[in-house]
Amino acid sequence: MAASTQCFLHQYHALRSSPARTSSVPSPKPNQLICRAQKQDDANNTSNAVSRRLALTLLIGTAAIGSKVSPADAAYGEAANVFGKPKENTDFLPYNGDGFKLQIPAKWNPSKEIEFPGQVLRYEDNFDSTSNLMVAVTPTDKKSITDYGSPEEFLSKVDYLLGKQAYFGKTDSEGGFESGAVATANLLEASSATVGGKQYYYLSVLTRTADGDEGGKHQLITATVNDGKLYICKAQAGDKRWFKGAKKFVENAATSFSIA
């Protein structure tokens, strides 16, 4: 008897911690050192010359401590900005679509593959198509994304975004899958925010399939409603590549999405 694929959503409360920030304390204003040459007899000339040189050295050293850090100075592991000009982020390129905008990884290429209803944009990694992003725009009668319910309830209404399993039938798969299930979806984080007067939902999901590779997929979803349209941006990467640097590109792409 055929059995359809099911995704089981398990909610995990992600703990957030704000990174510690250190504030720089301005160095005290260097004390002015005054050297006065006094007439001494010939026996003290050498001693006075040494004293003047020592005072001058202290004055220069104190002034150096009190001066501002040059833009050319670099933190450990960073290249020095010799000319003091602001560095440009060349890892991402701005993209302005019809009613939306986002940052796309510079080394990802446009793709013509259509996966979801209303899809208007798709980019993928040059070396691994599992790492990709897409934007879909569909009509809706909702006035706000909150009209879909909570972020978790919204995800249940658009669970097609998490992908479909090709196998249909009874099976007992290894890897922690329930009997008869060949796919799981774990909701790692769900949040909302107001940007430019619009409410946004942010979802982080880890999906796994019994026949999949990469150890699963990290899928980040950003969604909002504007002028009778539901805007969804989904960026993803395989679990292995996620921890090898893809996380940076997927997170930036998903969180940079907004209504233009």
Swiss-Prot record:
Keywords: Chloroplast, Membrane, Photosynthesis, Photosystem II, Plastid, Thylakoid, Transit peptide. InterPro entries: Mog1/PsbP_a/b/a-sand, PsbP_C. Gene3D superfamilies: Mog1/PsbP, alpha/beta/alpha sandwich (3.40.1000.10). GO terms for molecular function: calcium ion binding. Residues 1-74 form a transit peptide. The keyword Chloroplast applies. May be involved in the regulation of photosystem II. This is Oxygen-evolving enhancer protein 2, chloroplastic. It comes from Solanum tuberosum (Potato).
